[in-house]
Regions:
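MFS-fold secondary transporters
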Residues: 94-98, 110, 114, 185
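Residue-level signature of mid-helix packing/kink "hotspots" within the transmembrane helices
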Residues: 33, 61-69, 119, 151-153
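Cytoplasmic helix-loop-helix junction between adjacent transmembrane helices
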Residues: 110-147
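Extracytoplasmic
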Residues: 16-50, 71
Length: 191
């Protein structure tokens, strides 16, 4: 994107980048916090101790926090768009794998992968910063930051899905939604 002048980009293109990136971040944040809801049932199903449960819930948060450094570097090197899509697809894969994790160790490993979705924050910032000049970056990034509402999405919708279909369905639906949004993001955004 460095080869073109940012001032020549249409406002519509900027708004499209902002809205799709914010929606993608919302979905990633929803996935990142999935254990806050399904974790209680997993604890019961697997007979986890309080310590094991705490570690399970904290694992994706730790991964998402630590991976941001690398994802930020890669977003600078390769562009935010391909890295964001890779984060969404890999997070979707690990979220889907949750339904097959039948041991605590497998659940922890998939939780590590689910945590990649937490790194989407820095990728979106790197991507959107290139679309807006300095005078408009604060507003754009503030709107993007509203994607944290994904945690509320999980806390509001996941219990209904869990009651109706079980915690496995939550993982499946969140994974499918992430794949669909990754494709939409890729098709309708530009580098």
């Amino acid at each position: 994107m460095a080869w073109w002048n940012r001032t020549m980009v249409s406002t519509q293109t900027q708004k499209s980048a902002l809205s799709l990136t914010t929606i993608a971040f919302t979905a990633c944040f929803a996935v990142w916090t999935i254990f806050a809801i399904i974790g209680v049932q997993i604890k019961e199903d697997m007979g986890l101790s309080d310590t094991q449960f705490s570690l399970l819930i904290g694992t994706p948060i730790l991964t998402g926090s630590l991976v941001r450094l690398f994802l930020g570097i890669w977003a600078d090197q390769y562009g935010g768009r391909p890295i964001f899509m890779a984060v969404m697809l890999s997070s979707a894969f690990f979220t889907w794998c949750l339904i097959y994790a039948d041991t605590y160790m497998l659940m922890l490993l998939t939780a590590l992968g689910v945590g990649l979705s937490g790194g989407s924050f820095v990728v979106g910032i790197a991507y959107l910063s290139k679309w807006y000049d300095k005078e408009h970056q604060g507003t754009a990034l503030g709107i993007y930051g509203m994607g944290n509402i994904g945690a509320a999405v999980t806390k509001f919708i996941a219990p209904f899905v869990m009651v109706a279909y079980g915690w496995h369905a939550v993982a499946q639906i969140w994974a499918i939604a992430l794949v669909v949004l990754a494709v939409v993001f890729w098709v309708f955004t530009k580098d």
